[in-house]
Amino acid sequence: MGRESRHYRKRSASRGRSGSRSRSRSPSDKRSKRGDDRRSRSRDRDRRRERSRSRDKRRSRSRDRKRLRRSRSRERDRSRERRRSRSRDRRRSRSRSRGRRSRSSSPGNKSKKTENRSRSKEKTDGGESSKEKKKDKDDKEDEKEKDAGNFDQNKLEEEMRKRKERVEKWREEQRKKAMENIGELKKEIEEMKQGKKWSLEDDDDDEDDPAEAEKEGNEMEGEELDPLDAYMEEVKEEVKKFNMRSVKGGGGNEKKSGPTVTKVVTVVTTKKAVVDSDKKKGELMENDQDAMEYSSEEEEVDLQTALTGYQTKQRKLLEPVDHGKIEYEPFRKNFYVEVPELAKMSQEEVNVFRLEMEGITVKGKGCPKPIKSWVQCGISMKILNSLKKHGYEKPTPIQTQAIPAIMSGRDLIGIAKTGSGKTIAFLLPMFRHIMDQRSLEEGEGPIAVIMTPTRELALQITKECKKFSKTLGLRVVCVYGGTGISEQIAELKRGAEIIVCTPGRMIDMLAANSGRVTNLRRVTYVVLDEADRMFDMGFEPQVMRIVDNVRPDRQTVMFSATFPRAMEALARRILSKPIEVQVGGRSVVCSDVEQQVIVIEEEKKFLKLLELLGHYQESGSVIIFVDKQEHADGLLKDLMRASYPCMSLHGGIDQYDRDSIINDFKNGTCKLLVATSVAARGLDVKHLILVVNYSCPNHYEDYVHRAGRTGRAGNKGYAYTFITEDQARYAGDIIKALELSGTAVPPDLEKLWSDFKDQQKAEGKIIKKSSGFSGKGFKFDETEQALANERKKLQKAALGLQDSDDEDAAVDIDEQIESMFNSKKRVKDMAAPGTSSVPAPTAGNAEKLEIAKRLALRINAQKNLGIESQDVMQQATNAILRGGTILAPTVSAKTIAEQLAEKINAKLNYVPLEKQEEERQDGGQNESFKRYEEELEINDFPQTARWKVTSKEALQRISEYSEAAITIRGTYFPPGKEPKEGERKIYLAIESANELAVQKAKAEITRLIKEELIRLQNSYQPTNKGRYKVL
């Protein structure tokens, strides 16, 4: 009784407080107490297990932390575990001994009632105190473990604090530097304000809206930013506010400058484009293949906005300038003073003298009289000594009339044959023009600009110019493509009075480094050499941009050996009251050139060439002209096999190789050159005795320039032209060249031309003479622009070759894509799907079978096959069953005609009326729905664009977006290859029961293709088709 009550009181402290309860318990209560006692012990054991498990979990966590953060040594872990196990054992032994002592220390002389009460009280108090001690010890152990585990964390936090201090220190330094930069930026802006009246950009650049920028800046504040990004944004805001104050104080038309300001404006513009886009449906997400290469900020940039910004940046300096708002320095153009000897000449004497000088003809009022010697043109002694030194004894016919006309300040159109000295005719007045003006200051551009169509001609003019510029103290820079731009930029920054350039590279120089490399503000003298060739090669937009940026009261001079009427009309747009000087007729081969034309077969041309080389190569250098780069390389191999050392020159060769080849040919290191017409213009080679037109020239002007490479400066030369019977259409131009130069026309050439004319007349065709280069690359009028080839326009738009004047490039791309789709639309009435249950045959079905038989008989009667006739399969089956042979099936002409008509209808997407009536009757009996189909041909788009829209992911996205079915059909055919009958080029078939779904799918496909074309336009790199790399 006492033991039971003792245990009961020990495990239940709340009940032990009442002694009366324990005394009034029955035996059944005691039994229940025993069970409760056991349950309470098991609960204590469970609690201890859970505590030990939680302790183990904490230990494992601390060990993991230690391993990850500092990787503590394993010995410490083991020692710590040993210490913990010892303390745990000590705690267990203490608790056992304490329990024994408490049980053995009860007094025996007291009554049971007092004994029970006191023992239960002691045990209860002792149990509570031991529990509290255990709890305190456990807490201390846990704190020790936490301290040991957090030691590494404290160290890490200390490191993080130090790093933050370093970052804050760095930010403070950056903030100080930024404030210093703002001060420097203020100085630069003030300097830009002072020199603002000389800027060519101000009149065209629109000022950014400050309110709009402020609004976009507020939108950016709401985004979560990295602290460093937030600091950079604060710096940008400070710069922007400072710039706004400077703009408000400086006037309305002033432009923002400084790289930081430009960056901020660009960011604001891009953000605006993203914010303004309004999408009514969910945005179509695409897999970003370049996600690892670009940041999230770059992904926000709209493609069209970026492209527009890039193109605007490139064309910034090429926009037309309002010259009325720019104050130009006055300059002098008229330097010519007529000497008394020329003043005494009468008009009749002048006409006689002009006639003696190879028939000079002059158009235009106020043209001065021609000079007879160098001293009469008013040049300095330094130039006269240089002329004497380099062997210029007296002026040539073009020089006698052109030099006084240019010296008097007039614009000039000079037309003279090749080798007549046109270069000196515009160089001497140019030197006098430059020497009259003040010297260049730092940052100023050239005074004279000479533009040429080819790099070789530019180098040749530069070489000729340097003969005089050294003695005059002038600087000449040759600017041309194909070489490194950095060296040319360095030369231009040092300053140059004369620039000899090709138009494309000159525009690059004007746009480079925001226009700080060079400018056209000081230009007062412009020369266009080989002007017609320059316009013909497609340089018209570039030439006009450069000329339009030069002050309008400039002096402009144009020279060429050929000047077609169409080119002449175009040239007058940029000339002011010009004088036209023509020497020796228009485009005549020099009389010192002996011309021979040989009508020959293609197979015998090479043998004839070897014969000519064996006869003439000992006497001097030889040029062989061909029409294509491939032919030049092929002929080079054949000549090398025949043991003739030679070189080839064409547009596919690297510029450095071209320079070295021309130098070797001029120096006589290599005496045989195979070239295309790229070498025909302005190439002056001494000791050149023979020109062979291995491929016949396709127009008159090309023939004149090829033949003009020899017979220069009074030397004798020979020109041989090979022409085959297939090239009879070119014979007329060659006959014309021979007649105008006073050379007898070979009889076989005349016979070839007359036969060709008779053949064309018999075929009812009109013979049109080729005018040579027909101005590819620029537009003469509106009609020509409207009739341009659609596919070429798309290629130009995709590759970034469209003119800067085209403002509707984006609209053109959409139109070109639509035209290339060659879309075919169809609307079909489809029967509604019925149930699959097959009804049992009834009397009605039998009647329908009879109707079908009667219809079949009627169809056979319509096809004139007779009532009992059978189709082809039935005829073949009956023949085999009877053991006979299969005869050729009899098909009527009407059947063949119907089959052909079906093919034509399928191509034209045409449905006959009879078929429509039958479908309508069938549709009236059954429920039907319309099915919309459209086919988009994608065969002729670039490969990457086709891949973009035919990938599995893209088709799936478009189908989900538009709810239309899209399938790829047909076969890819390369350009120039047409599909056979029954085959089709690759196309996308769009099908849906909803017309809107088809339209949405088509619009999405168009968008993908347009984006790809614009991407190609922005990242286009030219691919070389020849053996050589093109720079």
UniProtKB/Swiss-Prot annotation:
The keyword Zinc does not apply. The keyword Acetylation applies. Residues 26-49, 112-200 have a biased composition (Basic and acidic residues). The modification Phosphoserine is found at S199, S295, S296, S346, S804, S928. The modification Phosphotyrosine is found at Y294. Residues 403-581 form the Helicase ATP-binding domain. SUPFAM superfamilies: P-loop containing nucleoside triphosphate hydrolases. Its EC number is 3.6.4.13. The modification N6-acetyllysine is found at K263, K776, K903. GO terms for molecular function: ATP binding; ATP hydrolysis activity; RNA binding; RNA helicase activity. Pfam families: DEAD, Helicase_C, KH_12. Residues 152-197 form a coiled coil. This is Probable ATP-dependent RNA helicase DDX46.
